[in-house]
Every structure is written in C-alpha cells, then in structure tokens.
Regions:
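N-terminal targeting leaders for non-cytosolic proteins
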Residues: 1-52, 61
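Short, T/G/N/S-enriched strand-turn elements that build extracellular solenoid repeat scaffolds
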Residues: 54-58, 133
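Terminal, low-complexity interaction segments
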Residues: 99-172
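Surface-exposed coil/turn segments at beta-strand junctions on protein surfaces, enriched
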Residues: 59, 92, 136-138
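A short, flexible beta-alpha/helix-coil linker loop
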Residues: 53, 76, 150-152
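Extended extracellular/luminal ectodomain segments enriched in beta-structured repeat modules
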Residues: 61-68, 139-140
Length: 172
C-alpha cells in the first residue's frame, strides 16, 4: 500500500495509492495503519464493462452482518476528478461518483437493499477515510462493489473505478 498526496502523480501508476496521510503515523491507512485494500471494477449498460465486480466474501459460507467499513478515494481517482486525463473530463459541480454494495445471502440470492456511498457529489470529494454503514444489507455471505458515476466518455463510466477500504467491521 502507498500514499501519494501529489495529484500530478495521480495516474494509473498510482492506482493503488491513497491521497490520505495520517498526521501521527505518516501512513495512508484508516486509523494510521500501513495497510488497506484497493478494489477496481464497475458495471454499467455500456457493454464495455462486463467483467466480475470486486467483492469480499466469507469463505466458510456462513452469512454475517457487515456493520461498516471505511472508504476513501485513491490518488488516481482524486487526480482525474480534479484534473481529468486523456479518457475523462474533470468532475463538474453536478457530477458524482458512488459506491454501491450488492449483498448475497447463503443461497446466493441478492438481498433487497443496496447501500450507496458518494465519493464525489454534493457533499464534496471524500479524500479522508469515512465510515460507510453496510448494516442494512443484513446477513450476507458475499458483497459485490460497483463503482459508478455520471462521467461518461461514450464508452461508459469514464472516471477510474478504484476505491480504497479499510477496517471492515463484522458482527459475529
């Protein structure tokens, strides 16, 4: 894991870096840790994004409530939202990028609720670790994560579909 607060470095070479830096430890993870996870992936109706979504799952197949996790933008996404690149324009005042959680029960059926979290939107850009409540999913075995947004370059969602997460809290 890495951190990079220089948005001029925020290209695909820093797709796994976060913009956040803890003031006490100097590391990029939530609560000052060195480690965090980065996921990439999206699905839309463009026909260009048809791969599997990034996910987390319980390998033992037992459903549990994922209470919350902390999320933030990667430096790559932060740079493109602010400055654009060859594939996307900078985010405008009405643009948005959000995460959508899609839960699955022990039978592999999708649960009814899909919690959303805006990384970019009316509230601003999320450059620090922020708690995302996932408890509305109820007991799940697997959660897919879709990164979607309003920027479309004619080939579907055009912002980098990366997000970082840390400190996943599970109820046992």
């Amino acid at each position: 894991n890495d951190l990079d607060k220089d948005r001029t470095h925020g290209d695909f070479q820093n797709q796994q870096a976060v913009y956040y830096q803890d003031a006490k430890t100097g590391f990029g993870g939530q609560n000052g840790s060195k480690n965090f996870c980065v996921h990439y992936g999206y699905a839309d109706n463009s026909g260009y994004a048809n791969g599997p979504l990034p996910y987390i799952y319980f390998g033992d197949g037992v459903a549990r409530v994922v209470d919350h996790m902390y999320v933030t933008m990667t430096t790559y996404l932060a740079n493109c939202v602010a400055n654009g690149n060859g594939l996307t324009a900078p985010a405008g005042k009405d643009d948005w990028v959000k995460l959508v959680a899609i839960g699955y029960d022990e039978d592999g059926k999708e649960v009814a609720t899909r919690p959303e979290f805006y990384l970019v939107g009316a509230e601003g850009n999320i450059l620090e670790w922020t708690k995302w409540d996932l408890s509305a999913l109820g007991k799940v075995v697997k959660i897919d994560f879709n990164v979607t947004g309003s920027n479309d370059n004619g080939y579907g969602f055009s912002q980098p579909a990366y997000f970082a997460y840390d400190d996943v809290a599970v109820r046992f």
